[in-house]
A protein has these predicted regions:
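Membrane-anchoring alpha-helices and their flanking helix-loop junctions
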Residues: 1-112, 116-119, 137-172, 176-199
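A short amphipathic helical element positioned immediately N-terminal to and/or at the very start
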Residues: 118-126
Length: 199
């Protein structure tokens, strides 16, 4: 396969992913919903984690685009093809996640918005499918255009996602939804899979 194919496919994966994010944000804005809650009304650990996560998520797409246009040494074709599959899977998971969450979807945690705990659909097998989708897209592009700066940026962002989940979101959801969320947390894994009733 020639480089034009890989470049076009990588750009399409990113366009679908970030386009979905932008469209959802605009749709929610038309309903007077503020999607981006990262760092808003926060203090302490929550503020630090969300601000750094916001920076990380801004850096990665820049690093991805620079990699697509500037990298000249590429991984073997089988790895790049695997990257395409992983990236497309990430797009699909993200679209389903955002659609299933409906108007309860936020980037970051809102202490003031009234939202519902969504536990059906894709959320019945993953408590954080949107974060999983980010990781899949990052991994997919990395497989197609591997370079060390992109790896560092992607890993840093993935670590910040994890810290956001563990240090901010899970604590917020437990406060907001109590035993309903605690029971859901016992049933469904953080990223993928369900647990047995015994757990």
């Amino acid at each position: 396969m020639n480089e034009t194919f890989y470049k076009t496919t990588a750009l399409a994966i990113l366009a679908v992913f970030y386009g979905c994010y932008l469209i959802k944000m605009l749709l929610q804005r038309s309903k007077s919903i503020r999607t981006d809650q990262m760092g808003v009304g926060k203090s302490g650990t929550a503020l630090r984690v969300e601000v750094v996560m916001k920076i990380a998520t801004a850096v990665v797409p820049i690093a991805e685009l620079l990699s697509i246009f500037l990298v000249t040494q590429y991984p073997p074709d089988p790895i790049r093809i695997a990257g395409i599959v992983i990236g497309i899977l990430g797009d699909i998971v993200f679209i389903i996640s955002v659609a299933t969450m409906r108007d309860s979807w936020r980037a970051g945690v809102s202490e003031t918005d009234r939202t519902e705990l969504v536990i059906d659909g894709i959320y019945s097998i993953s408590r954080n499918p949107a974060f999983l989708a980010f990781d899949l897209v990052y991994l997919g592009i990395l497989c197609m255009y591997f370079n060390w700066p992109l790896l560092a940026a992607s890993v840093f962002a993935a670590v910040m996602f994890h810290l956001q989940i563990v240090l901010v979101e899970e604590k917020f959801l437990l406060r907001a939804f109590g035993e309903e969320y605690a029971a859901y947390k016992r049933r469904v894994n953080r990223y993928l899979g369900r647990r047995s009733a015994a757990n």
